[in-house]
């Protein structure tokens, strides 16, 4: 079940491969995500010291958050993947034009996972073309549905 989807990622990038990564979260972040208080539209993944980090995602703390901690809504969060997957991703990202973007947050076995995509940025004309195709598919479906 998806918690948050990054629909903008599919508009701005053409996603070629998907990977599921674990997230290192604090307790208040998990509670806030359960309440639907997360945003990953501006998020991206960086590689530091052969580790992946999620930057730019915003998880708003609940008003009932503990008083003895100071929640940082946009802190850098570590992504957990197998070392073979990380080395494969590093090799691909070092190629020209590839980037890693968060696609969604979801639960798997009671834990929050982040689906990241290996993507290439779309040019403006590619975005327009994708939009035209989507509109035509919608129109086609509408025409097929309508009686007469």
UniProtKB/Swiss-Prot annotation:
Swiss-Prot/TrEMBL GO biological process terms: trans-translation
The entry's keywords: Cytoplasm, RNA-binding
Entry's localization field: Cytoplasm
Any one of the GO CC terms: cytosol
CDD domains documented for this protein: SmpB
PROSITE patterns membership: SSRP (PS01317)
Domain of life of the native organism: Bacteria
Species of provenance: Paraburkholderia xenovorans (strain LB400)
Membrane spanning stretches: none
The protein, known as: SsrA-binding protein
Major place of residence: cytoplasm
Annotated GO MF terms: RNA binding
Biased composition (Basic and acidic residues): 126-142
Function, as annotated: Required for rescue of stalled ribosomes mediated by trans-translation. Binds to transfer-messenger RNA (tmRNA), required for stable association of tmRNA with ribosomes. tmRNA and SmpB together mimic tRNA shape, replacing the anticodon stem-loop with SmpB. tmRNA is encoded by the ssrA gene; the 2 termini fold to resemble tRNA(Ala) and it encodes a 'tag peptide', a short internal open reading frame. During trans-translation Ala-aminoacylated tmRNA acts like a tRNA, entering the A-site of stalled ribosomes, displacing the stalled mRNA.
């Amino acid at each position: 079940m998806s918690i948050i989807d990054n629909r903008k990622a599919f508009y701005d990038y053409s996603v070629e491969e998907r990977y599921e990564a674990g997230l290192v979260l604090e307790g208040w972040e998990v509670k806030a995500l359960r309440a639907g208080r997360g945003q990953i539209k501006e998020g991206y993944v960086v590689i530091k010291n052969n580790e992946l980090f999620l930057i730019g995602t915003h998880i708003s703390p609940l008003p009932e958050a503990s008083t003895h901690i100071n929640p940082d809504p946009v802190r850098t969060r570590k992504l957990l993947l197998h070392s073979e997957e990380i080395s494969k991703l590093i090799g691909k990202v070092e190629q020209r034009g590839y980037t890693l973007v968060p696609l969604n947050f979801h639960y798997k076995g009671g834990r929050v996972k982040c689906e990241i995509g290996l993507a290439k940025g779309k040019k403006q004309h590619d975005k327009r073309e994708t939009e035209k195709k989507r509109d035509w598919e919608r129109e086609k479906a509408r025409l097929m549905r309508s009686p007469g």
